[in-house]
Design a protein with these regions (language model features):
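CE4/NodB-like, metal-dependent polysaccharide N-deacetylase domain
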Residues: 100-114, 134-135, 151-184, 191-195, ...
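Acidic-and-aromatic substrate-binding clefts and catalytic sites of carbohydrate-active enzymes
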Residues: 90-94, 114-122, 145-153, 179-186, ...
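A short, flexible beta-alpha/helix-coil linker loop
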Residues: 142-144, 206-207, 237-240
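Short low-complexity, flexible loop/linker segments enriched in glycine and/or proline
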Residues: 115, 126-129, 152-154, 216-218, ...
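His/Asp/Glu-enriched short active-site or ligand-binding loop at hydrolase and phosphoryl-transfer sites
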Residues: 14, 184, 189-226, 263-274
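Short, flexible/disordered intra-domain loops and linkers
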Residues: 240-247
Length: 291
């Protein structure tokens, strides 16, 4: 099993901000109040407005569920017994097969947001995912952390390349579901996604497996917060092959916990009431219509 590389304090702080949004809101409020005291009354309102606008700008880009640039779906309707497990950054031949085995054993369905070049390198896993009743969706071609800030033309090519890989490997039309790398969104990315007719899918429950990959801790975090309608984020892939091997055990514990709670795991399209992949318009027709 691959060892997990220790995270730098700066990166740990970054993930803390991203996945603990209520605490982020509290921290930001304290910053605004501190700015109020520092600026004094004469500059109170201009200073507060500037700080609030800065916070909104950061939130619109960084928060995965933000719909500032493009409509983003983070969960399904409440009140039911369905939830959706989603897996990012795969497929990984050292991890994904074990995850699929756990899903099969528990009669669960899931959605795999794949990196295009990973799918092209391991097409047999993509075909297996679909054959076993799961859904393959788009997580970009190469998962560059800077790609979210590139111009529209570059992002259109990057995303559509992954779309074509999905269609070629699975033999199905694309699901039209896209999850940006690390969940960030920008104006140019939104225009590219909109031109391709994709729906942006985020999540409402994060396993925080990128920070703490212990399967018991991952399952505990998910089961503590999950309710009907939630979309859960996990990772079956990483830049270092095999690093997410704890994912399969976490999936087992999560599925057992869901059963105890009376919840069932379905695909994202099923949770959201979207049509199945075969009912979608082929991607090349959409691309020919681009300006």
């Amino acid at each position: 099993m691959s060892e997990t590389r220790p995270m730098s304090p700066l990166r740990k702080f970054y993930w803390w901000l991203r996945w603990y949004e209520p605490r982020f809101a509290l921290a930001y409020t304290l910053i605004v109040l501190a700015g109020w005291l520092w600026l004094g009354w004469p500059l109170l309102w201009p200073g507060l407005v500037a700080l609030l606008l800065m916070g909104l700008a950061v939130d619109s880009v960084v928060r995965a569920g933000s719909s500032w640039f493009i409509a983003t779906v983070s969960r399904g309707p409440r009140g039911g017994d369905a939830v959706a497990l989603s897996f990012d950054d795969g497929p990984d031949p050292q991890v994904t097969p074990a995850v699929l085995e756990q899903l099969k054993r528990h009669g669960a369905r899931a959605t795999f947001f794949v990196i295009g070049r990973q799918l092209a390198a391991h097409p047999e896993l993509g075909r297996r995912i679909v054959a076993e009743g799961h859904v393959v969706a788009n997580h970009s071609w190469q998962h560059s952390y800077l790609q979210n800030f590139r111009l529209r033309e570059w992002q259109t090519a990057e995303i559509s390349r992954a779309e074509r890989a999905i269609e070629e490997v699975t033999g199905q039309a694309s699901t039209r579901l896209y999850r940006p790398p690390v969940g960030m969104k920008t104006g140019d990315q939104a225009r590219a996604v909109g031109a391709l007719g994709l729906k942006v899918i985020a999540w409402s429950v994060h396993s925080r497996d990128t920070v703490d990959p212990d399967p018991v801790s991952m399952a505990r975090r998910v089961l503590r917060h999950i309710r009907g309608g939630d979309i859960v984020l996990l990772h079956d892939g990483d830049r270092v092959p095999g690093r997410r091997q704890s994912c399969a055990e976490a999936v087992r514990l999560i599925l057992e916990g869901l059963h105890a709670k009376g919840l069932r795991a379905v695909t994202v399209p099923e949770l959201l009431g979207y049509p199945p992949p075969r009912a979608q318009e082929p991607l090349p027709e959409r691309l020919e219509a681009l300006p």
